[in-house]
């Protein structure tokens, strides 16, 4: 990602939403971020009667955000995402350098303890997953990586000799090394064999290579056809790249895994609101419970601020951290009334 101080090139697009997409792609933001920002800027423009946003200012932004909070009843995280989209649009697309951009109120996120699964609950969920979905869930729990990071793993990111997995350009565009669970090595090798069959099939059919990071694709346009850059968890069918329009093989869809995981949680009789991201929370809590220091866990999770990691220490204190309830000190009741 480009630094905030780097000069931005002139925009070629004419329509404001196309300008927004152009700037997002230039700065290497993810497709999901692009879709979210376009959604919120479009909603903002429609909210104000399709007026050009260059004619709108602080009061109009505040009115839109108030409507989201008071009428739409959106969550704090959704509210903050909408604000981030507008700040990006005014700052990076319209290049508006006005004080009100930074003075707009930001709602404080609620501090909720993350949902954490016990080892027994993880085993029960895994028992209702099959094939690639089970392996992927094991990988998330065994490494603590985010679901997007796991889906974007390339063949070259797995180092069986050194027992490491490289997560490239994770959140914040930072690379980090994770442990490759020994118990998963055989299954991951089998997964690579299945992936190679898909790769060979694409090669034989003359298919387009897999998508690459923008700068790399421009510099090495044929790299996407090479085996090291192929997906570890490749989709079994081809689809159209929403940005380039090229028909190619994508990685496994996150929605497909999300649905499979949700079914497994229900079938396992887990009443906690568990999602795939819960496996990451459970990984962090398990390491802290095993005695690993907070800085080690921070590095493995890829947190830029240790305060983000500290939330898991609060999870360990649930139940009073060994404090005995005064109710348990009362003598037993002789009879019920």
UniProtKB/Swiss-Prot annotation:
Outcome when changing residue 84 to P: In plasmid pLMO20
Name the UniProt record assigns to this protein: Integrase/recombinase
Keyword DNA-binding belongs to the record: yes
Variant or mutagenesis effect after changing residue 82 to P: In plasmid pLMO20
The keyword Repeat appears for this protein: no
Function comment: Putative integrase believed to be involved in the insertion of antibiotic resistance genes into plasmids and transposons.
Transmembrane segments: none
Phylogenetic placement of the source organism: Bacteria, Pseudomonadati, Pseudomonadota, Gammaproteobacteria, Enterobacterales
Domain Tyr recombinase: 112-328
Note: The sequence shown is that of plasmid IncN R46.
GO biological process: DNA integration; DNA recombination; establishment of integrated proviral latency; symbiont entry into host cell; viral genome integration into host DNA
Gene Ontology MF terms in the entry: DNA binding
InterPro entries attached to this UniProt entry: CB, DNA_brk_join_enz, Integrase-like_cat_sf, Integrase_catalytic, Integrase_integron-type, Integrase_recombinase_N, Integrase_SAM-like_N, Tyrosine_recombinase_XerCD
Core-binding (CB) domain ranges (all copies): 14-94
Superkingdom field: Bacteria
Family according to the record: Belongs to the 'phage' integrase family.
Keywords: DNA integration, DNA recombination, DNA-binding, Plasmid, Transposable element, Viral genome integration, Virus entry into host cell
